[in-house]
């Protein structure tokens, strides 16, 4: 029996507008395992954490390349997996990722055994391979959304081909 964890990524104001309890309980009811709120500062996670725990939905921690102390504090509390932000800024494709992510992963590994994966800007098989070699995986989002925008109803075939090329690189 195969189970693929599903994680929902949205902004905190969407959850607030809908109602945090209603939103997170609905996530649980439809089989969502985790919630990523990229605009939620770590210091404000307690707005959502008790509700996530109540409904067994992991509130996924994002860790940016900042100080070792901050990386350590955030990683000690992590649930589900850790989303390592490849570079500062917004999501989207990038031609290259130059951040020293090896040192970020090293600090995470010193503080937790929760898996970590790198995202923000991963769009090529080469980038996915490099990020997966540094961590437990690579997260691809914006590149898939662009394929869907381009092909609309015909996107499943193209998304499948793209994902296969990424998977083959790992």
Identify the role of each PLM range.
Residues 1-37:
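Active-site beta->alpha loop and helix N-cap motifs at the rims of alpha/beta catalytic domains
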Residues 6-10, 35-37, 59-63, 82-84, ...:
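Hydrophobic faces of well-ordered beta-strands that scaffold small-molecule active sites
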Residues 27, 74, 131, 141, ...:
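Conserved, mostly hydrophobic/aromatic
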Residues 31-44, 58-66, 72:
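Catalytic beta/alpha-barrel core
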Residues 32-36, 41-44, 84-93, 134-153:
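Glycine-rich phosphate-binding active-site loops on the catalytic face of alpha/beta enzymes
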Residues 66-76, 118, 122-138:
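Catalytic cores of alpha/beta
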Residues 72-110, 147-149:
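Glycine/Thr-rich beta-alpha phosphate-binding loop at enzyme active sites
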Residues 145-170:
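C-terminal helical cap(s) of enzyme catalytic domains, especially alpha/beta-barrels
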């Amino acid at each position: 029996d195969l189970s693929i964890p599903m994680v929902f990524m949205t902004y905190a104001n969407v959850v607030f507008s809908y109602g945090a309890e209603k939103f997170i309980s609905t996530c649980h009811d439809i089989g969502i395992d985790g919630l990523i709120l990229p605009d939620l500062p770590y210091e404000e996670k307690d707005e959502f954490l008790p509700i996530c725990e109540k409904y067994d939905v992991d509130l996924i921690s994002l860790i940016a390349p900042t100080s070792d102390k901050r990386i350590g504090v955030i990683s000690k509390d992590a649930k589900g997996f850790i989303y390592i932000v490849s570079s500062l800024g917004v999501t989207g494709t990038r031609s290259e990722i130059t951040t020293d992510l090896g040192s970020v992963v090293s600090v995470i590994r010193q503080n937790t055994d929760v898996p970590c994966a790198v995202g923000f800007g991963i769009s090529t098989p080469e980038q996915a391979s490099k990020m997966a070699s540094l961590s437990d995986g690579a997260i691809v989002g914006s590149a898939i959304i662009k394929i869907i925008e381009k092909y609309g109803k015909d996107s499943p075939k193209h998304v499948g081909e793209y994902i296969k090329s990424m998977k083959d690189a790992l």
